[in-house]
């Protein structure tokens, strides 16, 4: 995950907060995160958000999708196939501070720059859609607000922010699911910390308002929140 110039949340610690973490451990953890995205609602949340933005767009035209904090690149990679079946041509790009993560994303077919979300090497309105999934909760409130504003400035068409909805049942469900899938102890601990760092619906709405965007916030299966908005070019 990209920390860079953004302040990391003081609520617990996660392996992926540290860009200097052991590459082998990062790789294993990101593979488990990708499995969690598939089975616990992360990929479905992204599809939902993208669907809201793509539904009014003409089919067949290339659409650039920038995934900030792309991890292993599994979410944009899956989104490309999903969109293709609906007549949309997504062109994915990733941004990651972690070099091992960037390498994984590139190997999955997602071109990935090594950079931080606080200072992305991109011009304003340089991509069509910006995706930021399960990234905002890693940061302080002030930095998450800054991240939202960065997304809004980069996107020509719209933004999808997907994150975790905090709750006791979410933690219980993750404990059961991560055990069933055989996640390692580090991934389990990081997942529980991520849930603790997650948002309520009201918290995410308030954060977006402070950031200056008028977004639609939806609750989705798997204790997910998805915010979408169209940008003003």
What is each stretch, according to the model?
Residues 1-19:
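N-terminal auxiliary segments of SAM/dcSAM-dependent transferases
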Residues 23-49, 53-54:
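Class I SAM-dependent methyltransferase Rossmann-like catalytic core
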Residues 66-68, 72-119:
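Class I SAM-dependent methyltransferase SAM/SAH-binding core
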Residues 131:
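A conserved beta-strand element that flanks and buttresses the S-adenosyl-L-methionine
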Residues 139-151:
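A short, conserved alpha-helix within the catalytic core of class I
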Residues 155-164:
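Conserved beta-strand signature within the Rossmann-like core of class I S-adenosyl-L-methionine
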Residues 164-208, 217:
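C-terminal alpha-helical "lid/dimerization" subdomain adjacent to the S-adenosyl-L-methionine
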Residues 215-233:
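Core SAM-dependent methyltransferase catalytic element
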